[in-house]
Amino acid sequence: MDVLSCSINTLKGLYDISGVEVGQHFYWQIGGGQVHGQVLITSWVVIAILLGSATIAVRNPQTIPTGGQNFFEYVLEFIRDVSKTQIGEEYGPWVPFIGTIFLFIFVSNWSGALLPWKIIQLPHGELAAPTNDINTTVALALLTSLAYFYAGLSKKGLGYFGKYIQPTPILLPINILEDFTKPLSLSFRLFGNILADELVVVVLVSLVPSVVPIPVMLLGLFTSGIQALIFATLAAAYIGESMEGHH
């Protein structure tokens, strides 16, 4: 009962976290509920950038890749290497998932560092990078959790749950709690870093001439890429861990 109540409280905590707001948000009223409009708008922009870039790069594929095709093949090879390193020889089916996570977070983070979302005037609220909203990072973390549960169950069936009593049944509560804290650590790490970067850039732009914040923006681009890589690497590591059945 203690483990069950702890798990329920953790899930309730994730729901409560979704109400955290930084800045002025605006909402769409749909039925009896509210939808975070600013997250959807900026997410659609990021998705459009990814789809548009991929379409342009591969619309006329060449045997010997050049230009955009060469760049995207390099990105694909990089994602494959990350997936294979963390998951192992059965990495193939997980490359699309890891790649989607990495590219979405990478472009979202860079949009926060390059695009002045908060300067765009809206009737109500303000825009920000998708990963600047705790709802986005929690959703990505929960998707990762579902992925590694699915990976473990598809590989081992119900025997997957045997990992919770290894190496000793005494660790059952800790092992269960660990699976619920992974989404929290993933989401807070990404949310905190991107939020801090955006706030620093906005403050500097409002206080000093435009040329001064450039070094900070360049640092933000670097850290944004690192955060995307960390998230994707940990997601792949969790999936590989669930398939291997060890910690």
Swiss-Prot record:
**Could you give a GO molecular-function term held by this entry?**
proton-transporting ATP synthase activity, rotational mechanism
Q: Does the keyword Transmembrane apply?
A: yes
Q: How does it sit in the membrane?
A: Multi-pass membrane protein
- Where do the TM regions start and end? 38-58, 95-115, 134-154, 199-219, 220-240
Q: Mind telling me which Pfam families this protein's record contains?
A: ATP-synt_A
Keywords of this protein's UniProt record, alphabetized?
Answer: ATP synthesis, CF(0), Chloroplast, Hydrogen ion transport, Ion transport, Membrane, Plastid, Thylakoid, Transmembrane, Transmembrane helix, Transport
Where found?
Plastid, Chloroplast thylakoid membrane
Give the chief site where it resides.
Answer: plastid
Q: Name one GO cellular component term.
A: chloroplast thylakoid membrane
Family label = Belongs to the ATPase A chain family.
Its quaternary structure? F-type ATPases have 2 components, CF(1) - the catalytic core - and CF(0) - the membrane proton channel. CF(1) has five subunits: alpha(3), beta(3), gamma(1), delta(1), epsilon(1). CF(0) has four main subunits: a, b, b' and c.
Q: What does this protein do?
A: Key component of the proton channel; it plays a direct role in the translocation of protons across the membrane.
Q: Which PANTHER family match?
A: ATP SYNTHASE SUBUNIT A, CHLOROPLASTIC
Q: What is this protein called?
A: ATP synthase subunit a, chloroplastic
Organism whose genome encodes this protein: Ipomoea purpurea
Classification of source organism: Eukaryota, Viridiplantae, Streptophyta, Embryophyta, Tracheophyta
